[in-house]
């Protein structure tokens, strides 16, 4: 080379752009416009806290970064009002909330610390980790939303847990050293849950019902596996498994030219695990996930409603109510692998007949006494709580 240097914050092949330069700012907005004009729905703003640098700081969350985001948002709102900016900032919610601004920066932001605590709660069979992080999540401006997720294209990050919790997660979910990467676990959802259909359904039900917009990682809807023999994060980035045909239907190219090899192991191999086969099986995870998403879409409270956790008598049960006007939903989740009873204080809804959403079954009327439910291991209920009392129907 020429013996010259450039600044980079992450990999050596990722030079940092100089946002101090107005020409760089304009060029980036031009790049955004190029893709927006092609019809893209929005952008995930990767590592958004690090746009600007300033001597004497750690270069995170600087005021000029927020000023530039406001400019980007203003330009997008003017010409592309139906598009979304999703902030990716691997920080605590109290810091990330700044990227909403006053509703004039990003529309959405990922909620990172919730994800490992879902895994922790189910393995410990106690709701406390989920309850704690949700209670620490600040309010956000109207028109903004958290993006919640179970897995993504990186490792399951363990940056925002204690050392003790990190060791626990490694021991429970990363038995092989190859499963670890950076400060996290590089595994997909299905292998993390040992391919347990019950657990995958419970995790997905939590993803679709907790506060925020669900971000579903490709392949998790069919229970795709990973390849821990591939380097760094590539193990969870293998081609989508569409069919049992050449290259899993992802491409017709020579298999050696694929960006990564398709999964070919006995459990998650593409020949048996693919979209085509699951579309032909009415009981498949894919059909179940589509039904759950359809159910969610019929209840606006899941997207914009308030969230209130109920103090369930059983610590293995996570129960909460989502409300948006007359659209009221009760969600009850059993984090234990064993059947569990629970008594809920539903006196506020006395006289209401809960209706289970997926089957339409009417459950016993809510009275003044604690409301008793029993749930199978890793089971859950979604109930509507109709505004009309039973005697008014």
Regions found by a protein language model. Give the residues of each.
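Active-site and adjacent substrate-binding regions of carbohydrate-active enzymes
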Residues: 1-393
